[in-house]
UniProtKB/Swiss-Prot annotation:
Zn(2+) binds at residues 430, 433, 448, 454. SMART domains: BRCT, LIGANc. It comes from Brucella melitensis biotype 1 (strain ATCC 23456 / CCUG 17765 / NCTC 10094 / 16M). Keywords: DNA damage, DNA repair, DNA replication, Ligase, Magnesium, Manganese, Metal-binding, NAD, Zinc. One of its GO terms (molecular function) is metal ion binding. Its EC number is 6.5.1.2. The active site is at residue 128. It comes from the Bacteria. Belongs to the NAD-dependent DNA ligase family. LigA subfamily. This is DNA ligase. It is an enzyme of class 6 (ligase).
Length: 719
């Protein structure tokens, strides 16, 4: 996961990271919900989700249709069990990771409901069982189906296996509603897990990893006898469809479940204050090691069901409940070395090589060190961390399985009398390509400036180069780019942008013909070559955007193209721009530097990124090869349009029925307007279609003019 703060991400970096996060979270959802073999800890997964949500909040225009924030769980993986559509969706819960998060949750409940006295709303608190969510349906008192959560909408029918769990009644007592869906968690007790593993070991079979995965796998057995032998258990805590509600509170419903014969958790209690909830959270945390089942937090719910109804739901979670997660587990080990990894955006990330240690049941050999400052003992705001202690090779360190894809080092334990190693010197060159690694002012991350030549960044750079708003080469999708990049045959490989345009020529005299490779054919290869040839002349702003210069996203590429009009002029400016000397207030930088800063919307950060890019010899070599194949077209000088929206900032929101978002954007720019992805005080006009939500509300709040799509067409004279 990236260590760059969300506020410092460029639009290009944010879009790329959201794409990676969507793929990663979907992958881990499938492993956890559908295949019962997770690769990362719950804390690491939560960190991915939090990072995704933070980026979406900062870049609302980039929210993807397949965003993890709109999805619950994973679709059933195999057709072994028949699908079951839940009468009411089985949603997930939002997470709290601190006392402050819990106070914010309770505060949000009071704010939403409005004008209720303090401490007048009761909340229940119960352990969050680490098992498999299950919905059990009864009709006229008889168990008719059991279904897993699946993706929240559709689960798997595991009725035969559910019937083998002794703690789940096959019949409900007389007087139960005609339709009842009891929901809860199927789990395996720790003691039963240890007994099962001892039995497997005695039989010379492979043992299981943990109780949660074992319970999930046991429930998906084709032979119900196998499920029966695994001694699965159940806690009831929620419900789905009910033809009649037998109680009016959360606690009352759970008590009804107990009376019907379901096991319910004895640690569930009700409180009227945040302090009571937090005290119970800590009490359960203290009792956690002695429990015979795994838990990973405490769930808080508004107790009154009428208030739950008023609070309602977000897209994938209820407003009236939250899961307060337990902190990560820690262990002490030795730091044996520090490796530098180069990410797809050029960030140099230090990774600790550790003496192997078991943390929370997982053997850990590597941990993240975040960045250069973290190793030195400096925090994100320049404050000392770990009491200012730096991290050195040979140190005893505390490792925590927490909010990163790999664990992290959280502290150093200095041993009296033991001589420490030398302070770690962070590299100033990229280990992947040898280019300079620079650190921008105000950033903790050091980045490779190799860009187009760096192998660690190459795949991502080429994907960006051929993307829709850059060179837009049809037939070079994600899979095709990876295929060409990994190809060892010189007649097939694409390692730099210029290689795309020499592919056809290299193929002419090659024995390895592209059309003979699986996935390609004569027709598709011809289309690919035609698509490539169609981009040998390219608009200047697309060319600049395609280079992937840091901070030069689509908007800034257009600003630079309109300012310099030709690539020759832009290149000359980039090579002649010299920033002011650091600390010299009288130095304003070169004339070319001052001219670049004079371009609307281009500040010193963007200008420095351009200068760094062109200052790297490797990049100039790659550009020379590319320009031998491609011609950037001069930009037409903008003339006054006389349009009523000229010079204004426009935001489009909601569903557009007469044009796509790209068409709307192009139309606005054609009339001299600028478009933005979010509403702010700088917004002049909002065009709102059906389904407009937060942006429309923000515009109304700020008093910004709002019109519909038809009025927009009339306004710009294209009706």
């Amino acid at each position: 996961m990236s260590d760059i703060s969300v506020e410092k991400l460029t639009e290009l970096e944010a879009a790329a990271e959201l794409e990676r996060l969507a793929r990663a979270i979907a992958h881990h959802d499938e492993l956890y919900h559908a295949k019962d073999r997770p690769e990362i800890s719950d804390a690491a997964y939560d960190a991915l989700k939090r990072r995704n949500e933070a980026i979406e909040a900062h870049f609302p225009a980039l929210v993807r249709d397949d965003s993890p924030s709109r999805r619950v769980g994973a679709a059933p993986a195999l057709a072994i069990f028949a699908p079951v559509v839940h009468a009411r969706p089985m949603l997930s819960l939002d997470n709290a990771f601190s006392d402050e998060d819990v106070r914010d949750f309770v505060g949000s409940v009071y704010r939403f409901l409005g004008q209720l006295p303090d401490d007048s709303i009761a909340f229940t608190a119960e352990p969050k069982i680490d098992g498999l969510s299950m919905s059990i349906r009864y009709e006229n008192g008889i168990l008719v189906s059991g279904a897993t959560r699946g993706d929240g909408t559709t689960g798997e029918n595991v009725t035969a296996n559910i019937r083998t769990i002794a703690e789940i009644p096959n019949r409900l007592p007389a007087g139960a509603p005609a339709v009842v869906e009891v929901r809860g968690e199927v789990y395996m007790a720790k003691s039963d897990f240890l007994t099962l593993n001892a039995q497997m070991e005695a039989e010379g079979k492979q043992t299981y990893v943990n109780p949660r995965n074992t319970a999930a796998g046991s429930l998906r057995q084709l032979d119900a006898k196998v499920t029966a032998s695994r001694k699965l258990r159940f806690f009831a805590y929620a419900w789905g469809e009910m033809s009649d509600m037998p109680a009016d509170t959360q606690l009352g419903m759970v008590e009804v479940f107990r009376q019907w014969g379901f096991p319910v958790n004895p640690l569930m209690k009700r409180f009227n204050s945040v302090d009571g909830l937090l005290a119970h959270y800590r009490a359960i945390g203290m009792e956690r090691p002695t429990l015979d089942y795994d838990i990973d937090g405490v769930v808080y719910k508004v107790d009154r069901l009428d208030l739950q109804t008023r609070l309602g739901f977000r897209s994938r979670s209820p407003r009236w409940a939250i899961a307060h997660k337990f902190p990560a587990e820690q262990a002490l080990t030795i730091l044996r070395g520090i490796d530098i990894q180069v990410g797809r955006t050029g960030a140099l990330t230090p990774v600790a090589r550790l003496e192997p240690i078991t943390v929370g049941g997982v053997v850990v050999t590597n941990a993240t060190l975040h960045n250069e400052d973290y190793i030195k003992g400096i925090g994100q705001k320049g404050e000392p961390i770990r009491e200012g202690r730096d991290i050195r090779i040979g140190d005893s360190v505390i490792v925590q399985r927490a909010g990163d894809v790999i664990p992290q080092i959280v502290d150093v334990v200095l041993e009296e009398g033991k001589k420490r190693g030398e302070p770690y010197q962070f590299p100033h060159v990229c280990p992947a390509c040898g280019s300079h690694a620079v650190r921008e002012e105000g950033e903790a991350v050091r980045r490779c400036t190799g860009g187009l030549i760096c192998p660690a960044q190459a795949v991502e750079r080429i994907r960006h180069f051929v993307s829709r708003n850059a060179f837009d080469i049809e037939g070079l999708g994600e899979k095709q780019v990876e295929f060409f990049f990994n190809a060892e045959d010189p007649a097939l490989c694409i390692r730099s942008p210029a290689d795309i345009f020499t592919l056809k020529k290299r193929q002419e005299n090659s024995l390895t013909k592209l059309q003979n490779i699986e996935g390609f054919g004569a027709t598709s290869v011809k289309k690919l070559y035609d698509a490539i040839d169609a981009r040998r002349e390219i608009a200047l702003h697309r060319f600049l955007f395609g280079l992937g210069i840091r901070h030069v996203g689509e908007v800034n590429a257009k600003r630079l193209a309109r300012a310099y009009l030709s690539y020759a002029a832009f290149k000359k400016a980039a090579l002649e721009a010299v920033p002011p000397k650091e600390g010299d207030r009288t130095d304003k930088g070169s004339e070319a530097w001052q001219d670049m800063l004079a371009v609307e919307g281009i500040g010193s950060i963007v200008a420095e990124a351009v200068v760094d890019f062109y200052g790297e010899p490797h990049n100039r070599e790659v550009l020379a090869a590319l320009l031998a194949e491609v011609t950037p077209l001069d930009e037409e000088a903008r003339v006054a349009t006389g349009s009523p929206v000229e010079g204004k900032t426009v935001v489009f929101t909601g569903s557009l029925e007469r044009m796509s978002r790209d068409e709307a954007k192009a139309m606005a720019e054609r009339h001299g307007a600028k478009t933005a992805g979010s509403v702010s005080k700088k917004t002049d006009l909002v065009v709102a279609g059906p389904g407009a939500g937060s942006k429309l509300a923000k515009a109304t709040e700020l008093g910004i003019e709002v019109i519909n799509e038809d009025d927009w067409f009339k306004l710009v004279g294209e009706d």
